[in-house]
Amino acid sequence: MKILQTIAEFGAHWGGITTCTYDLLSALHKQGGDVDLLTLLPKDSTDRLLGNGEEWIHALKNDSITPFAYSANFKRWLDINYSQYDILHTNGVWLYVHHATCVMARKLGKPYVITTHGMLYPDAIKRSYWKKWPLLKLCFHKDIMQADCLHATCKQEMEHIRAFGYKGPVAIIPNPMVLPTPPSAKRSPKGKKVFGFLGRLHPRKKVENLFYGLEMLKERQDECEIWIMGSGLPEYESFLKSEVKKLGLKNVKFLGFVNGQEKYEKLVQLSTLFVPSDFENFGMIVTEALSVGTPVMASLGTPWEELNKQHCGWWCDRTPENIAKVMLQVLDMSSKELEEMGERGKAMVEENYAAMQVANKMLQLYSWLLNDGEKPSFVYEV
């Protein structure tokens, strides 16, 4: 069983989609899976290709053109090498790489899988709809509807896939979490409580709600500080800094882009991570924070009801009032209470989201698609 996964770009700056794809593929190889990845080199000269030079990563010169990102290099490689693969699996929709993967699979009569990575959420489809509508009519509606399976990371995403109209099998397999090297940094038991955001700076992340929540703490503001970790749209970052200045907040720090082990060294120092986004398909940062014992507050636009069920955080509306309420709860919690909450989160991640367990589910899915085994319990049919 030989699998080809494809993705439009594989640069570190692409964020969660590339990271979770790399983590899954690495775990698949450790499980004995025969999986290759086909992608294009990053166009941004400041970006770098993820990975460590693995032979299974085929990164082609990036010759993509037009908003559709047509690539003659990608097409040429597929034309030459397609016959050696049993299943094709693409990560995402809307770009030529995704369409070409689906077309090639249909041409060969081989099964293909699409991991939608949240791109069929209503809010995601609405963004740049003027670009997506003609592409949907021309090719992507067919690509999606004729897929042998769509991969969703949570039940919420599957519901949006069904609402889109897809009636084929949907596999719910979470994004994998590679448990990090234990950070050397520690949360200060006696210092200020630290609240944080880590992710791409974009208006839909609603980072400003942290500032509005902090402003509501009034005289208790001095008991805490906020770390904003990430980069993104320059105009949005400027807006955030202007809001901090307008509100007169003195305890907000912008730390810039962090990744790798540095990310975990920062996360472990937080008293709580806040994810106040409009929506998140999965939200890798949630499992990353939980994996080092940091409680998380995530908005109802994320699929993280488990935070409430497992008592390792807060899943609630991301209004400034609710954020302020969570901040006050954390300020009133002892170090022991925070540590116990963090340990529950860490245990949940290790039990349900560890990369090797996720990779095993993906291998089960591939085997089932090739008529080798029973339908897995995580595959849902209409």
Where are these regions (language model features)?
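Conserved donor-binding/catalytic core segment of Leloir-type glycosyltransferases
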Residues: 4, 177, 186-214, 227
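Aromatic "clamp/platform" in nucleotide-sugar-dependent glycosyltransferases that forms part
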Residues: 93, 278
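Short hydrophobic beta-strand element within catalytic cores of glycosyltransferases
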Residues: 295-299
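Carbohydrate-associated surface elements
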Residues: 156, 176
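Membrane-proximal helix-turn-helix segments that form the acceptor-binding/catalytic region
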Residues: 107, 133-149
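Nucleotide-activated donor-binding/catalytic signature segment of Leloir-type glycosyltransferases, i.e.
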Residues: 238-258
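N-terminal strand-loop element at the rim of the active site
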Residues: 7-14, 20-21, 27-69, 162, ...
